[in-house]
Amino acid sequence: MTHADTDIRPLTADQQEFAALTGTHWIRASSPSDAVTVTGAPGTWYADGGAVIGTGLPDNPQGQVRLAPGDRIVDGGRVFAGHARAGVAALRTFDRDSEGARSVTGVEVFWQDDAWVVDAEFTADPQTVTVISADGVEGPGEVVGWLSFSVPGDAPGESHHLQVTDQDGDFFVSFGDAGAQAGTHPFRFLNVPAADQDGHTTIDFNAARLPALAFSDAYLCPLPSAVNVLDVAVPVGEKRVVRK
């Protein structure tokens, strides 16, 4: 069911892949002698030097494959990829024919509203914070400061604040908003251009996008910190995943 201010958009290629993730499997075996089987993957697996090693793989001339984080191999409609977090290696399994992948049919997206392209001021405040991933694991994260801004409906002088990280010279933010009470995904991601020399930038909330976790709960996305949950609804950007 959609609302008058939203449309249904087909999945992008990236979102199709997000939906196909069936598992993030942490590999703690460290030698061929204690290699483990992984649900949805052939052969047996162990970790070595930050990579995962698969052995006894069918249709592989060497019978073995090494997948460092970001490496992947394709096996028909399935994909196997290396991953790591805090020095622990994992094997990610993707299957576009999985029930989860087939259940995702599109993304509900709010209509564009240029009123939600807002001016913002950046205040540098670099610090190390605790980041909580979707599976509850905590780890350190580096933030670079705050963006301060007003949104449509604010009273004169009212403002909001988001803590941001650096991403390739621009800003990245994981944020939640009060719209979650009306069906918007509990949190979304947003990229913001770097501030100019006077600290000015522009936030386009229309570009708010769903995290990979919205498509498959096998992802381990960073949750927004309490300070990044806005007390107003943000009725623009991607709203939620549509399923059968």
Label each region the model flagged:
Residues 1-41:
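N-terminal cleavable signal peptides for secretion/export
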Residues 13, 28-29, 40, 106, ...:
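C-terminal, non-catalytic interaction/recognition modules in large multi-subunit enzymes and RNPs
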Residues 26-73:
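Forkhead-associated
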Residues 42-47, 77-84, 159-164:
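Broad, structure-driven detector of short, well-ordered beta-strand segments within folded domains
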Residues 78-148:
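Surface-exposed beta-loop interaction hotspot
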Residues 100-102, 127-129, 182-184, 211-214, ...:
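Short helix/loop capping segments that flank catalytic or ligand/cofactor-binding pockets
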Residues 148-196, 206:
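Acidic/His-leaning functional-site neighborhoods
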Residues 193-244:
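Long, compositionally biased interface segments
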